[in-house]
Regions:
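Bacterial N-terminal signal peptides that target proteins for export
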Residues: 2-13, 19
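C-terminal segment of classical bacterial N-terminal signal peptides
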Residues: 17-25
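N-terminal alpha-helical modules
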Residues: 24-138
Length: 138
């Protein structure tokens, strides 16, 4: 049940980002792996649920981060030098923002809090960025 509430919170975050996106920008949703879905479904909702959620998210983050890096490299190869430099600058700024935001979520009033919030934030933001880079590819 809490897994569903957590997924609803993630979905609302994605919807909010969609409303903020400029008109005409396609917002595809990242599809998490079946292993991640299975891991989240197996979380025991007892006292250790937050560490289990964090472990699932951390494991999936490795896959999503690899996809993001693949899209980034492919896009870099297709850009002009000035565009490549702008993309690199943008990516560096985004990495700093992601770290700061997810560190805040670990400390902030957002449920579930702690390492689980930080891991889930990292996963969600990385998936969104991977989608963005993928959608820029021809």
């Amino acid at each position: 049940m809490q897994h569903l509430a957590l997924r609803a919170t993630q979905a609302l975050s994605i919807l909010a980002i969609g409303w903020l996106a400029p008109a005409g920008v396609a917002m595809a949703e990242y599809h998490y792996s079946p292993q991640y879905e299975t891991c989240m479904d197996k979380v025991d909702l007892g006292a250790l649920k937050n560490s289990q959620w964090a472990a699932c998210a951390d494991q999936e983050l490795k896959k999503v981060d690899a996809a993001l890096n693949t899209y980034y490299r492919k896009l870099q190869q297709q850009l002009e030098p000035e565009q490549r430099e702008a993309l690199k600058k943008s990516q560096r700024a985004w990495l700093q923002y992601r770290e700061a935001r997810c560190s805040f979520e670990a400390l902030g009033p957002v449920a579930p809090g702690g390492a689980a919030s930080q891991s889930l934030c990292m996963l969600e933001m990385t998936a969104q960025k991977a989608d963005y880079l993928r959608d820029l590819l021809p």
